[in-house]
Amino acid sequence: MRSSAKQEELVKAFKALLKEEKFSSQGEIVAALQEQGFDNINQSKVSRMLTKFGAVRTRNAKMEMVYCLPAELGVPTTSSPLKNLVLDIDYNDAVVVIHTSPGAAQLIARLLDSLGKAEGILGTIAGDDTIFTTPANGFTVKDLYEAILELFDQEL
């Protein structure tokens, strides 16, 4: 098997193992990969892969600390349009809530603030991956929601 094909198989197996959310140590991941036929895998390589794919330790349903991949649709690249950073847009009677890729909320909020009151935006509050935005006078929350959907080419 070609080296790149073998590497792709390793990455696929690695991600599948992390999705199981049952491995609490790098050694356990090494052992599981070796059982699948990846004989040249070691703790150092697993550590680099965990870092490369942004794996984190979190509690699973059994309250055990395990490695898993973050719930992110994709890591943005330099050629990604900003709209790819917006994952979901919803609203209630008071605010429009925008969910973004981790770390992208402040960038998107800055863009919305720059559009300002002319587009119906009174202001925004951004965390790491969530934005609250409220409509300016003369605009309803639904108007603002629809304007933001259109801005990011989202479906109703």
From Swiss-Prot:
Task: Tell me yes or no: is Ubl conjugation among this UniProt entry's keywords.
Answer: no
A Gene Ontology BP annotation from the UniProt entry:
protein complex oligomerization
A Gene Ontology cellular component where this protein is annotated is: transcription regulator complex
Q: What is the effect of changing P76L?
A: Increased affinity for ARG box in the absence of arginine
Instruction: Look up what happens after changing A105V.
Output: Defective binding to arginine and to ARG box
Q: Where in the cell is it found?
A: Cytoplasm
InterPro entries in the cross-refs: Arg_repress, Arg_repress_C, Arg_repress_C_sf, Arg_repress_DNA-bd, WH-like_DNA-bd_sf, WH_DNA-bd_sf
Mutation: E21K; reported impact is: Increased affinity for ARG box in the presence of arginine
Name the Gene3D superfamilies for this protein: 3.30.1360.40, Winged helix-like DNA-binding domain superfamily/Winged helix DNA-binding domain (1.10.10.10)
Q: Which SUPFAM superfamilies match?
A: C-terminal domain of arginine repressor, Winged helix' DNA-binding domain
Task: Quote the function comment for this protein.
Answer: Negatively controls the expression of the four operons of arginine biosynthesis in addition to the carAB operon. Predominantly interacts with A/T residues in ARG boxes. It also binds to a specific site in cer locus. Thus it is essential for cer-mediated site-specific recombination in ColE1. It is necessary for monomerization of the plasmid ColE1.
Q: Outline the subunit composition.
A: Homohexamer.
Q: Which family does it belong to?
A: Belongs to the ArgR family.
* Protein name in the entry: Arginine repressor
Q: Which organism is it from?
A: Escherichia coli (strain K12)
The organism's lineage? Bacteria, Pseudomonadati, Pseudomonadota, Gammaproteobacteria, Enterobacterales
